[in-house]
Regions:
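Haloarchaeal acidic low-complexity proteome signature biased toward cell-envelope/secretome components but also
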Residues: 1-53, 59-61, 66, 74, ...
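Short helix-coil junctions and helix-kink-helix linkers
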Residues: 67-70, 86
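Short amphipathic alpha-helical segments embedded in low-complexity Lys/Glu-rich regions
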Residues: 63, 79-83
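Short, positively charged loop/turn segments that connect secondary-structure elements
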Residues: 70-80
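Bromodomain acetyl-lysine reader domains
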Residues: 83-84, 88, 92, 102, ...
Length: 199
């Protein structure tokens, strides 16, 4: 396709459509999860505030725009700055993507810790499927026992950060899942082989 205004417009339109499809697929994947600890009305108001940003937006853009905004959850009150990494390394394709991150504060705080630790690596690129796999692993840990103090999430995020610092590279998503499964089994949680953590 020639590089002209029409081809650039078509490419931008296709990119937006693919992002919407990914967001919808992620929402469908999450439909079986328990309700997030943040009130739906509050999330809707938060998403409306994000519409002033131009997407895709970096974590730095989000924090600059709404970083001091408080989000109340069952676990307590968090600012967006505590949940979204202040970095240009992570981008959000839409307000829905930011909302999806913020609606599970303990997972969001752990992901922020991981993303910020990965910035220290010279050639690491924590994006796409690896980032999604890390987040899905943490969500699965949260779903296993929603009543605990999120010790599993903290243990695995600490393990990932230690690996980044000690080995100076990102652990593979399978290694993260394997470590999460070890943690679960060591703490008496049953993991079936057909589940995400069942490696």
């Amino acid at each position: 396709m020639a590089d002209n205004k029409n081809s650039r417009d078509k490419k931008a339109h296709d990119d937006e459509r693919r992002q919407r499809e990914r967001d919808m697929a992620e929402e469908l994947e999450r439909k079986d999860e328990k309700e997030p600890p943040v009130d739906e009305a509050e999330l809707t108001a938060f998403e409306t505030e994000l519409e002033s940003l131009e997407f895709p937006a970096t974590g730095t853009d989000v924090v600059a725009a709404v970083g001091d905004r408080e989000v109340e959850s069952d676990d307590g009150t968090y600012t967006v700055e505590e949940l979204v990494p202040d970095t240009d390394e992570e981008t959000f394709g839409s307000p829905t993507a930011v909302r999806a991150r913020v609606q599970r504060p303990t997972v969001a705080a752990a992901m922020k810790q991981i993303v910020e630790a990965s910035e220290m690596l010279p050639n690491a690129d924590l994006r796409g499927s690896q980032l999604e796999a890390y987040e899905k692993t943490l969500r699965e840990l949260k779903a296993i026992d929603a009543d605990d103090d999120d010790e599993g999430i903290q243990a695995i995020s600490d393990w990932i950060v230690e690996r980044i610092r000690d080995k100076e590279k990102l652990p593979g998503s399978r290694a993260v899942r394997r470590q999460a499964a070890k943690y679960c089994r060591a703490n008496g949680y049953q993991i079936r082989n057909d589940e995400w953590l069942g490696i």
